[in-house]
Amino acid sequence: MSDIAKDKAARLLKKRGSIISLGSHDVKPRGSFSKTKDSVSTVSYIDEPGHHDEIQSPAILMENTYQIGPAKRFPVASVNNILKDVLTSYLQEEKYEAELCRQMTKTISEVIKARVKDLMIPRYKIIVLIYIGQLNDQSMRVGSRCIWDPANDTFSSYSFKNSSLFALANVYGVYYE
């Protein structure tokens, strides 16, 4: 098998499969003999821009608009309503099952992204992150770091919980100059 075919197969496998990282096996400091429970995190889907197998279409050149700020602001309240509606309708009666929740994160993120795009907010890039986990009296911290313009870029967040699972949805609206 040629190197090109191996690279293509590896990219397809990476794109379609799951990536599992064992957090406690990555780096262990010398002299640490304490027993720790292994932490496992799973990423079920990664879309890497620029590594698509299709033939790339030529870039479309657009003229400068010289518009520095958005004509329409990112509607945080409307996006919060979308997050609440989608998470409640999809997860209200669900019980936590790992494989089901893995599929639901993909579905919910696509639905939320489509509904936010239906608001037709010009010149904003939309990023949707969904976290679903089992509810077991644990705590969790989720953080994100971005370099952005606080005057134009913003986010919306909503958390949901029922008797067996929790979900957190974040939508980032980043102004595209």
Curated annotation (Swiss-Prot):
Q: What Gene Ontology cellular component terms go with this record?
A: cytoplasm; cytoplasmic dynein complex
Q: Which Pfam families match?
A: Tctex-1
Q: So where does this one cross the membrane?
A: none
Q: Which GO terms describe its molecular function?
A: dynein intermediate chain binding
Q: Which CDD domains does the record associate with it?
A: DLC-like_TCTEX1D1 (cd21458)
Q: Name one GO biological process term.
A: microtubule-based movement
Q: Which range is the signal sequence, renumbered to this chain?
A: none
- Which family, according to UniProt? Belongs to the dynein light chain Tctex-type family.
Q: What is this protein called?
A: Dynein light chain Tctex-type 5-A
From which organism does this entry originate?
Xenopus laevis (African clawed frog)
Gene (name only): Dynlt5-a
